[in-house]
Every structure is written in structure tokens, then in C-alpha cells.
């Protein structure tokens, strides 16, 4: 009884508490929600619905080993619902609605603005791989009793690739929105390490074997892929600089081009008014007058001197080249965190380069011999 209680206490200490299932892009979705509150503060809510997102590779079939999930629709819903109040997911359950209506239920139905379609389109197993094996054996004691020692080490690493394609459909027209799609690939690592050792006397042998295997979960990789794809889709639809929600993100040319075309289609007065709206997001006390008045000129001088000094002192808010940085670089709470992480990564890379250079100099140094 005492041993059972002791064992129970030991395992209770080792028991892990539930943890949030978050990855880099899950946090990015939450940041996108904050960004939408800043960029789209006066815009209506975006209602989104999705078709069933299935596996088109058929590798989710039990006959193929069911290596990947066959339906990732719920992952897409979770990712969309994580963004925040500016993006609302509209479920599609017609059977449930009909049944409730027959029971006397009264409710309204919200029509979505956009429909998301797509599928898991690629699963390349063993896309690339590498392995190494080392063997050694020693025999001694011949004539006086044979003894054999053996050792074997094997390491194998294999990469697989998963791809997800998502597209956006305008619900009112039932037409795909041009260039509003995401097609992303994630690589999954499967690594195996095996060690064998044996010892034999007179032909009788005993030995041991240790084997370790590390395989990134394909379901977890697909969730990361879904979060990334939803982030890209919503960022494109809303023309929001979503790439700023992840470290070292690069501007999306589709969003940049769409914003440029929309800006250049405006009259000069409306362009100035839009710039005044953006200056307010930099905490500048300006009014939207669509005129380059004194408060606006002062705010422009302060903001551009602090954030974009490379553009000089002569700023023309009606030119896209001068408006673009103002629009895409509104300060966000996580900017400083990203800067610190980038600086730390740069310092670590520089330190590793210096250590490698020092090792190279040490190995290249000539060896001197002194005569005694």
C-alpha cells in the first residue's frame, strides 16, 4: 500500500497541466485582430464563411494509413474566430436551422461577405532525406576463448512536405476574388537515431539496443499551416499589412499594389484627408479637413522626422512614395519586442561568426618546434 501511494505521488508530480495550443501564427492572428481595430476602426464587421476544407491527396484514407487529417474545416474556423471582433465567422448548418424552425425557433440569418474554399493539395512523403551509419567490432582472445565486441550507430533524417491552398469567393456574386488566395507549404521532420551494442563470449552473446525517434506531428504542422494561410487571406482581403504580425515578415506585393491603385484613384484632397486619418493613428492631434493646414504640416514634420528621416523634409502627401510608409508603419505594441528579438538574433549570429573565425585562425596557425 505504501509503495502504491509513493508511486502515485511520483506520477502526480510529473503530471503536466493543460497548455494553450498556440504557435507563432496563432499569436499573429491575435495581433492581426488588434491591427484591424487600428486600421479599420470605422469599417463594418467582415463576415466570413467557409466551405468544407478536405484532403484532396486521399492520404487521409485508412487504406493509405490515415497519415493526415481528412477534414481541416474546424481548424479554419478556429483560426478565423481567433482574430477578433472585426472578423466574424458565420457557421453553415442548414439541417440544424431547419430543425429548429420546425420546433418554432425564430432567429435571424447573417449572410457572409466572403466564402473561403480550399483543400490540402500536397503531401510529399520523404521529400528529402539523409542518413549515416557507423559500425565497429573487435575480436580478441583467439585460442584462449573468443570474445567479440560490437557497436552500431545509425542516424536518419527525412523531410516531408504538406501544402494547403485557400481561395476567397465573393458571396454576393459567387465569383472568386482575383489574386485573393494563399498557397503555403510546411516541411515536417522525421528523425530516427538508433544505437546497438553487443558482447559475446564463446559464441554466446548478450547486448542492448537503444532507439530514439523524433517526428514532428503532422496534425500540429497542418494547424500551423492553416493559421498562416488564414492570416494571409484575411490580410489580403482587408488590405492590412499582416506581415508585420510575425518577426521578419516581408510586405505582400498584392496588398501593396491594391493600396497603391486605390490611393492613386483618389483626388488630391481625399489623399490629404486619408493622410490626416493616418496621422491620427500616430497620436497626432489633427482634424480631417482634406486641407494641408498648419496643424497637419506640423504633424507631418514631426512624424516623418521621427519615423522616416530618409525621405527628407519636403513631404508631399499626395504622392504614393511619401504616403506608403505612413500607411504601412503605424506603430504597434509588439514592434519593440520584434526589434529586441532581431537585435538578439543579430548579436548571436555575430558571436557565432567570430567564434568560427577564431577557430579557423587557430587551426591555420603554424606549429613551431623548439630544439632542446
What are these regions (language model features)?
Residues 316-372:
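Short, low-complexity, Pro/Ser/Thr/Gly-rich segments in the mature regions of secreted, periplasmic
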Residues 1-44, 154-267, 347, 351-372:
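C-terminal/domain-edge helix-coil "capping" segments
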Residues 55, 77-85, 230-242, 280, ...:
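Sec-exported extracytoplasmic/periplasmic mature domains
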Residues 57-67, 152-153, 211-219, 262-268, ...:
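Second-shell loop/turn segments in exported
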Residues 43-128, 161-165, 171-178:
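N-terminal segment of the mature soluble domain
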Residues 28-32, 68, 72, 76, ...:
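Stable alpha-helical elements in mature extracytoplasmic
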Residues 265-273, 280-298, 302-326:
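Short acidic, glycine/serine/threonine-rich helix-capping segments at coil-helix boundaries
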Residues 51-56, 88-104, 248-254, 292-296, ...:
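Acidic helix-start/capping segments at beta-turn-to-alpha-helix junctions
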Amino acid at each position: 500500500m505504501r509503495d502504491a501511494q509513493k508511486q502515485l505521488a511520483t506520477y502526480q508530480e510529473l503530471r503536466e497541466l493543460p497548455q494553450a495550443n498556440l504557435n507563432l501564427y496563432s499569436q499573429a492572428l491575435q495581433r492581426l485582430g488588434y491591427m484591424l481595430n487600428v486600421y479599420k476602426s470605422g469599417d463594418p464587421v467582415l463576415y466570413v464563411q467557409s466551405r468544407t476544407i478536405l484532403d484532396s491527396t486521399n492520404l487521409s484514407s485508412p487504406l493509405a494509413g490515415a497519415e493526415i487529417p481528412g477534414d481541416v474545416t474546424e481548424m479554419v474556423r478556429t483560426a478565423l474566430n481567433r482574430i477578433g471582433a472585426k472578423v466574424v465567422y458565420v457557421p453553415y448548418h442548414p439541417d440544424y436551422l431547419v430543425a429548429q424552425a420546425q420546433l418554432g425557433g425564430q432567429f435571424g440569418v447573417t449572410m457572409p461577405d466572403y466564402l473561403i474554399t480550399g483543400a490540402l493539395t500536397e503531401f510529399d512523403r520523404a521529400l528529402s532525406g539523409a542518413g549515416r551509419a557507423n559500425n565497429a567490432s573487435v575480436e580478441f582472445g583467439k585460442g584462449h576463448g573468443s570474445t567479440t565486441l560490437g557497436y552500431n550507430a545509425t542516424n536518419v533524417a527525412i523531410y516531408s512536405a504538406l501544402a494547403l491552398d485557400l481561395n476567397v469567393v465573393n458571396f454576393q456574386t459567387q465569383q472568386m476574388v482575383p489574386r485573393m488566395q494563399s498557397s503555403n507549404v510546411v516541411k515536417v521532420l522525421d528523425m530516427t537515431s538508433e544505437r546497438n551494442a553487443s558482447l559475446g563470449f564463446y559464441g554466446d552473446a548478450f547486448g542492448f539496443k537503444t532507439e530514439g525517434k523524433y517526428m514532428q506531428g503532422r496534425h500540429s504542422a497542418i494547424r500551423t499551416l492553416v493559421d498562416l494561410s488564414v492570416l494571409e487571406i484575411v490580410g489580403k482581403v482587408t488590405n492590412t499589412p499582416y506581415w508585420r504580425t510575425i518577426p521578419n515578415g516581408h510586405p505582400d506585393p498584392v496588398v501593396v499594389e491594391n493600396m497603391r491603385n486605390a490611393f492613386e484613384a483618389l483626388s488630391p484632397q481625399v489623399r490629404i484627408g486619408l493622410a490626416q486619418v493616418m496621422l491620427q493613428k500616430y497620436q497626432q492631434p489633427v482634424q480631417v479637413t482634406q486641407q494641408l493646414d498648419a496643424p497637419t504640416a506640423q504633424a507631418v514634420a514631426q512624424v516623418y522626422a521621427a519615423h522616416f528621416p530618409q525621405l527628407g523634409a519636403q513631404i508631399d502627401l499626395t504622392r504614393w512614395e511619401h504616403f506608403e510608409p505612413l500607411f504601412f508603419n503605424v506603430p504597434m505594441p509588439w514592434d519593440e519586442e520584434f526589434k529586441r528579438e532581431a537585435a538578439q538574433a543579430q548579436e548571436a549570429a555575430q558571436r557565432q561568426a567570430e567564434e568560427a573565425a577564431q577557430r579557423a585562425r587557430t587551426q591555420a596557425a603554424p606549429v613551431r618546434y623548439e630544439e632542446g
